[in-house]
Swiss-Prot record:
Complexes and interactors: Component of the ER-mitochondria encounter structure (ERMES) or MDM complex, composed of mmm1, mdm10, mdm12 and mdm34.
Biased composition (Basic residues): 362-374
Name of the protein in its database record: Mitochondrial distribution and morphology protein 34-2
Biased composition (Basic and acidic residues): 375-385, 459-468
Free-text comment about domains: Lacks alpha-helical transmembrane segments, suggesting that it resides in the membrane via beta-sheet conformations similar to those predicted for other outer membrane proteins and porin.
Organism ancestry: Eukaryota, Fungi, Dikarya, Ascomycota, Pezizomycotina
PROSITE patterns: SMP
Record bears the keyword Hydrolase: no
Sequence segments annotated as region (Disordered): 206-239, 299-423, 440-473
Originating gene: mdm34-2
Skewed-composition ranges (Polar residues): 299-333, 391-402
Organism name: Penicillium rubens (strain ATCC 28089 / DSM 1075 / NRRL 1951 / Wisconsin 54-1255) (Penicillium chrysogenum)
Amino acid sequence: MAFNFNWSPLMADASFYTRAQDLLTAALNKSPKPPIIVDDIHVTELNLGSIPPELEILEIGDLAEDRFRGIFKMSYTGDAFLTLKTRVQANPLNTFLLTRPTFGSPVPLAAATPLTIPLQITLSDFKLSGFVILVFSKQKGITVVFRNDPLESLKVSSTFDSIPFVRDFLQKEIEAQLRILFMDELPAIIHRLSLRLWVPEYRTGEEMNDETDNTAKSSEGPGQDPLASPPQDPVDSLGNALNESEIASLSLDSSVETHSLFSQKNLLRLAALTDSQRTLSLFTPSIQEVVYRAWTSPTDTSEFPSSVISPLSPTLSREQSQMGSMSSLHETASNASMQSRPSMSSHSFSTSTYGLSLGAGRHSKAHARKRKKRVVDLRRPKTTDDAMSVSDESVMTESSRPPSIASAPLPIVNEPSDDPVTPPLSPEVDCHLPIIPERHLPSFSRPTRRDADLSYSHETIRGPKAEDVDATPRATMRGYPQERAEAGPSSNQRTPLPAAVLPFSKDENANVDPVLVDRLAGEIARRMREDKLMTNACSGFWSRQHEDSPPPAYGH
């Protein structure tokens, strides 16, 4: 398969060269130029030469009468040349200062004087080699895409060939610009030229656009005064609207000039610009009740106190800040205690209520309470009244606190409260028996003071009771009081113990061996010490085996 490329019509068509020169001029001025070039680049001469490029067909994708698509290997070493004209800056100091900021430059007086010299550059001896994707269509023209950089070398001849430094500089800069031209701009130039040659509609449209541009350029005269004709909504200098009769009565000789008429819309925009944050934008959002430092002088600063604030940044008063922080702190503490100790829901309820109702003052009662050591009470309460008895301080805190607005109504928890609770005491009886601790529920409370006569609780001589299902230790904030207020009606109505069970009652006829009493007291003290040592040595009271057998009673 052979192809015949007719290169001579391109050389003979003058209109083709004119159009190609215009396209090349636009392409060379489109890309950013080096600062040494101070004028536009004009293509004054273009010649494709008599030697056509050599094409080697690598692949044909589509072949028809009106379309073609293929891949070629192109190589060109011909006599085409291109002549350019421009103006360059001969003073390098001027070029250096133009590319540096003014505040950092020395600003010389005479050494930086610009010196522009006309420059003529001729590009010749092109050597091209590369792979070309060619797509031809009579309706869409020719599309040429280079897969690689086709420029191998070229010769640059200029006015400064006698200066080696300038010659080398121009050679390097022009080669860089031509590589960009071949990869980006040349395919678009070839496509537009092909449309002008083969598509009549495109040619007609371009001719009409050229005529329109020429007419617009010729009709342009001196600038028209936009204020010569009155605006649509005229107002005077004071902002008062003017009607048509007032406008018609105005003349050039009158005291009110026509140029003093302004549009209401323009006045609003000027007012918005004045009220903006010293920016050039007409739509800068304004912030109410804000005093800007740039607006006030040092004398005006004292007139505006610091209390002038923006609604977007409200004042953070001490009460609001303290209420938010303390309430969140107490809520966090209450949640942590709720998760770690399920049986202390009543305590966490009171803690969260206390945190929600904060904010009445900076120094609340929580800071006034003394830190007390928590005492664990493992004895099961006798009655509901004793178990739910609360200390006077806790009751006063809960009852005297006013309801907070921020606190929402919370459900009532029926579980036994873990707030400071006064442990139930044994009923006051006339018997004085030594205390024998329960072996299946060891107590971790601090040892209270005992009199010389150790009182013996009647719990030790009762029958074994059912084990406590809830093994969670019950805590209290204070030890056993020495003197206890009279108990509830349930504790006062307990059945007195029979006389046979109380051998140590104050009876003159009772004969008790004091040696036996001392021996039993020593045995009880030894057992208490052993239990305490075992409790401290073991991992906890959870692993201890419950012993349901009560200790032996005295006198039996």
